[in-house]
């Protein structure tokens, strides 16, 4: 091996030169300079010296045998990194680099493992010895505590059974009790310290010098003695377990004896305080140490699901329903999705859907009604109690349009109402009170047009007698049959008035025969229906008709309660510009006074004025009296009940409740419709829609017009009435029509000045109508214009194939004779064989001799080339046809 210098060797080993020189001097090699040479023998001598140990190594933890316990090695390494240097903003050219010197220092320490294991073993043995000493102390304390507890128990039993001794026992037991408590506390402290000794390091324990000495002695014992110590430790563990079990059994027995001795204690207890009470409390502490631990309460998970009774109103939101079931809204929405219902957290659902969801979630639904206050009001008005008086009959005149209902009533009233109606047809329910020699009667005139079915149904429900007017020259018509059905549904008697008897073609027997087919049998034919022949023009039979009505009313014995809150029904409602909402009301029971608080549907208010059919203001209206009521908060629906209530606050509450319930139901229905039509809406682009906005003079007309227009909907064109209302057309109506691109229809109403200006500025489509026929017909024509036209095929002519030729230019050519009609060049054709279509296509060529022609008529021969078809045979027929677009209509 080549010799190295001291400095080179120091760099190789990784230690300072000064330290290497000191080690060489300590090894007896003398002090050497940095450049002095080191031979292989010098290095071996230095290594032997280092292995034997040196004072420096002894300081670092060298062993007594000369071998080092810990060796620390240090190394250094140098390297260079080239990094790009910064460049000025104005400079150009390649980027400069700079060199960075890097020095890495490493230090590793090696420790002798055998010494570490010996140290850990020593510490563990010391901990075991300390634990054994503490265990012995614990056993002594437990034995002492058991003796004290047994002595206290004997003293307690003596106190329970003794009479006078019970008073002396507390004072005698006070001292042992006070002594027993510290001992128990000491025992607990010992237990805690024992746990800490086992868990902590030996240096952190409270072991003293004696424990360490015993541990050292234990280390020097032979292996047999260690086995004996292990057996003794196991024996101590077993005894401690037996002692613990015995203590628990005794505690249970003491608790049972105390439970049995409770009645005796109550007899033996004397009212005493101070020391005696304290002794009793101390006795409880002594006896209940272990029992207190056993009686400690713990939370137990429910083994069965909690079933709740969930109250469900008529409409409820998803969030509220989830809250009532104590589940998360997300879980409820997930369950709804399983049921096929898509909903949001704030969406309202109906009662039936909510009940199904509650059952699916494992709870019990309880259906709840929101109209308790409303039912109370209805019960008050259903059975009015009080003095009953006779009332005038309510007579409804029904029949087909143009059969003379209003003219008949005009003659009875001596008025001209029919001439004032637009188009000469009735479009409102008219209520009139007629005074006669035989008494008074209230007549209701209903529309006969098919659009007013709801009006006729309402008229039949609120009447006592139905006068069915049938024209003698026209017979039974569709609305006549409908009127009979309404009367039967309402169980109202019918009086038939065969009108227009003054005409030459009048045939009353035909009317009787047609009505008898509907089971309306005249009295002269053995039935129970009165037939009266009348004429509204000449007045023929009017007295007989009134007599028949009076007779029918007498048979019914009509009564009404006089002294009760007034109750009636709304015949019609309209919005008057000067008077506000106006409701035409037929009073049925009680007297309606000015100033009464009334409620009708979702509207309420105080009666400001009462106006009769002649336009005069009255202070009250009795049973069977039609009257106009002013003062309601809004327009009630026709057919709604109206009743007087004493408390205006209750009326407001019921009206608001009805309005809210109606709104929620409407929202729920709209949402349900959206869900049901989810897939049909995907094809909505293919369906055209006509949006309409309807304003009418009265509620009944608006309702009839809206229903009639919506019934015009077609599978290709849908009619949607975005809004319908009562009153003049306002600026807000025009804005709504602009937003929804709707056509505005004014039925017997006009637009105000602001609305007219907006209509002219924005070009809104606005139409005025006074006859319902015209409005329906106009919309029907608009729908027909939006329908896609159909294609119909018209056969132009037929040619019979006589011979088939082959051409170099055209291929197969059929020599034909046109037997019917005309064959044109640019029209489609069909090839028929044995009257069966085998090919559909078009002509490629049509020639007469050698000339191309556009058409060939019947009886003329021609040559026909069929495009893309080469299987024409003699005897086939070539049919020429055209497709024509035909406009569809409803």
Curated annotation (Swiss-Prot):
Residues 424-428 are annotated as: G2. Belongs to the TRAFAC class translation factor GTPase superfamily. Classic translation factor GTPase family. IF-2 subfamily. GTP binds at residues 399-406, 445-449, 499-502. One of the essential components for the initiation of protein synthesis. Protects formylmethionyl-tRNA from spontaneous hydrolysis and promotes its binding to the 30S ribosomal subunits. Also involved in the hydrolysis of GTP during the formation of the 70S ribosomal complex. One of its GO terms (cellular component) is cytosol. It comes from Halorhodospira halophila (strain DSM 244 / SL1) (Ectothiorhodospira halophila (strain DSM 244 / SL1)). It is found in: Cytoplasm. Residues 445-448 are annotated as: G3. Keywords: Cytoplasm, GTP-binding, Initiation factor, Nucleotide-binding, Protein biosynthesis. Residues 535-537 are annotated as: G5. This is Translation initiation factor IF-2. It comes from the Bacteria. Its main location: cytoplasm. Residues 399-406 are annotated as: G1. Residues 112-125, 136-147, 217-262 have a biased composition (Basic and acidic residues). Residues 50-304 are annotated as: Disordered. One of its GO terms (molecular function) is GTP binding. The keyword DNA damage does not apply. Residues 499-502 are annotated as: G4. Residues 390-559 form the tr-type G domain.
């Amino acid at each position: 091996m080549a010799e190295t210098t001291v400095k080179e060797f120091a760099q190789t080993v990784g230690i300072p030169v000064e330290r290497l020189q000191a080690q060489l001097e300590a090894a007896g090699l003398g002090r050497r300079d940095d450049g002095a040479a080191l031979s292989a023998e010098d290095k071996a001598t230095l290594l032997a010296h280092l292995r034997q140990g040196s004072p420096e190594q002894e300081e670092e933890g060298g062993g007594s045998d000369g071998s080092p316990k810990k060796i620390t090695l240090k190394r250094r390494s140098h390297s260079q990194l080239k990094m790009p240097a910064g460049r000025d903003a104005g400079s150009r050219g390649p980027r400069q680099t700079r060199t960075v010197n890097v020095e890495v220092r490493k230090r590793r320490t090696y420790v002798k493992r055998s010494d570490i294991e010996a140290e850990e073993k020593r510490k563990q043995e010391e901990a075991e010895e300390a634990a054994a000493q503490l265990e012995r102390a614990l056993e002594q304390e437990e034995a002492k505590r058991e003796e004290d507890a047994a002595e206290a128990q004997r003293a307690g039993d003596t106190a329970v059974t003794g009479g006078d001794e019970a008073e002396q026992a507390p004072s005698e037991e006070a001292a042992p009790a006070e002594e027993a408590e510290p001992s128990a506390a000491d025992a607990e402290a010992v237990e805690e310290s024992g746990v800490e000794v086992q868990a902590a390091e030996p240096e952190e324990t409270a072991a003293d010098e004696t424990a360490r000495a015993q541990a050292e002695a234990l280390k020097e014992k032979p292996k047999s003695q260690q086995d004996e110590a292990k057996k003794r430790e196991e024996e101590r563990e077993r005894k401690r377990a037996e002692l613990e079990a015995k203590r628990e059994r005794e505690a249970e027995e003491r608790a049972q004896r105390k439970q049995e001795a409770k009645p005796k204690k109550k007899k033996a207890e004397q009212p005493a305080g101070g020391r005696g009470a304290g002794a009793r409390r101390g006795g409880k502490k002594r006896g209940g140490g272990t029992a207190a631990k056993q009686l400690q309460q713990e939370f137990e998970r429910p083994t069965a699901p909690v079933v709740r009774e969930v109250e469900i109103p008529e409409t409820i939101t998803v969030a509220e329903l989830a809250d009532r079931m104590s589940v998360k809204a997300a879980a409820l929405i997930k369950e709804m999705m399983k049921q096929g219902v898509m909903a949001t957290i704030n969406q309202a659902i109906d009662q039936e859907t909510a009940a199904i969801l509650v059952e699916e979630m494992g709870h019990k639904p309880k259906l709840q009604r929101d109209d308790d206050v409303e039912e109370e009001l209805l019960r008050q008005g259903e059975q009015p109690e009080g003095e009953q008086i006779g009332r005038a009959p309510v007579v409804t005149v029904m029949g087909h349009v143009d059969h003379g209902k209003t003219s008949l009533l005009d003659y009875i009233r001596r008025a001209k109402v029919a001439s004032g109606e637009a188009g000469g047809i009735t479009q409102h329910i008219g209520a009139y009170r007629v005074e006669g020699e035989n008494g008074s009667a209230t007549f209701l005139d209903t529309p006969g047009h098919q659009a007013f079915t709801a009006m006729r149904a309402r008229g039949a429900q609120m009447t006592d007698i139905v006068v069915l007017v049938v024209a003698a020259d026209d017979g039974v018509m569709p609305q006549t049959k409908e009127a009979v059905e309404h009367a039967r549904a309402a169980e109202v008697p019918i009086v038939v008035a065969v009108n227009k008897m003054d005409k030459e073609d009048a045939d009353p027997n035909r009317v009787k025969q047609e009505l008898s087919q509907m089971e309306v049998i005249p009295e002269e034919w053995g039935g129970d229906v009165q037939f009266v022949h009348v004429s509204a023009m000449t007045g023929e039979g009017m007295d007989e008709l009134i007599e028949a009505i009076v007779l029918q009313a007498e048979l019914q014995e009509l009564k009404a309660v006089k002294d009760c809150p007034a109750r009636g029904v709304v015949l019609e409602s309209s919005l008057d510009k000067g008077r506000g909402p106006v409701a035409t009301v037929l009073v049925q029971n009680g007297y309606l006074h000015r100033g009464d608080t009334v409620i009708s549907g979702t509207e309420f208010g105080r009666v400001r004025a009462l106006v009769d059919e002649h336009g005069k203001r009255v202070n009250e209206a009795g049973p069977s009296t039609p009257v106009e009521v002013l003062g309601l908060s809004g327009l009630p629906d026709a057919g709604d009940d109206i009743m007087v209530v004493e408390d205006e606050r209750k009326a407001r509450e019921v009206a608001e409740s009805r309005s809210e319930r109606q709104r929620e139901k409407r929202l729920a229905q709209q949402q349900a419709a959206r869900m049901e039509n989810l897939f049909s809406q995907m094809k909505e682009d293919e369906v055209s829609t006509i949006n309409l906005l309807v304003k009418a003079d009265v509620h009944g007309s608006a309702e009839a017009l809206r229903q009639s227009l919506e019934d015009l909907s077609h599978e290709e064109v849908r009619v949607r009435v975005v809004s319908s209302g009562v009153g003049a057309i306002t600026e807000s109506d025009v804005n709504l029509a602009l937003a929804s691109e709707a056509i505005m229809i004014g039925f017997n109403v006009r637009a105000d000045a602001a609305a007219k200006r907006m209509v002219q500025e924005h070009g809104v489509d606005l139409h005025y109508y006074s006859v319902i026929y015209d409005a329906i017909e106009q919309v029907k024509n608009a729908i027909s214009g939006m329908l896609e036209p159909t294609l119909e095929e018209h056969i132009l002519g037929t040619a019979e194939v006589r011979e088939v030729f082959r051409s170099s230019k055209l291929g197969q050519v059929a020599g034909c004779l046109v037997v019917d009609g005309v064959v044109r060049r640019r029209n489609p054709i069909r090839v028929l064989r044995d009257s069966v279509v085998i090919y559909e296509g078009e002509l490629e060529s049509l020639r007469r001799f050698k000339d191309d022609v556009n058409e060939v008529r019947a009886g003329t021969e021609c040559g026909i080339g069929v495009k893309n078809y080469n299987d024409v045979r003699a005897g086939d027929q070539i049919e020429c046809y055209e497709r024509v677009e035909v406009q569809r209509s409803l």
